[in-house]
Amino acid sequence: MLLRTLLWGSIVMTAATLQAADADTRVYEMRTYWAAEGKLDALNARFRDHTTKLFEKHGMTNIGYWVPLENPDRKLIYFLAYPSREAREKSFKDFLTDPQWQKAQRESEVNGKLVDKVESRFLQVTDYSPAVKPAKKGERIFELRTYTTTPGNLGALNDRFRNHTLKLFEKHGMTNVAYWNLMPGQEGADNTLVYILAHASKEEADKSFAAFRSDPDWVAARKASEEKAGGSLTVPEGVKSVFMRATDDSPIQ
């Protein structure tokens, strides 16, 4: 009996160790660039020909690069990953002082700067996110969704996604790509969920969401979670959606 107990304890500890080893503890960064008027193509070309390679040279992992399907603001949205915030700071410092980058930047900006504005947010994957890794699966579109929760309800929202929403998305033909919360110390860190889905097309996305919203399992899960929280888990207009296409050099396509 004692031997059996010890063996069982060893198995449990081994499983826990493996689970911890598999946990993605990387720091993610979501970067949004607003290209200067008429410069989005040149910006994408600079990333394709120079920037992504130099990021990798300096220890940064390219996760994915996207542009919105409707893009009047000329946005480029991309994600990087690093072992830590300290590693991120060192990598960017080395990148910015790399003569190859300085030459590429100088030559690409002969006729003016390519970027008007940059926004950065640091993220950590949720414990229910699929593994974030390169994937090229043919023609498809992506959807970046950002949720802002009512006060104190980010945990409840994560619980609902973990226990119900992801499975129902897959049931209705949507692909879960990645899920993140903001890292502490940033505005919105206690109330923001950011995630990416993939769809066969915009039309298929609309069909999938219509079927999802009318699914009795979703209706029940939503009702139960909102009754427990005493109301909606998200603020009014707290769900933002951007449909995107991957750039031709994006590791996730």
Task: Describe the role of every protein-language-model region.
Residues 4-15:
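Bacterial N-terminal signal peptides
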Residues 19-253:
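Short S/T/G/P-rich N-terminal loop/turn motif that feeds into the first structured element of a domain
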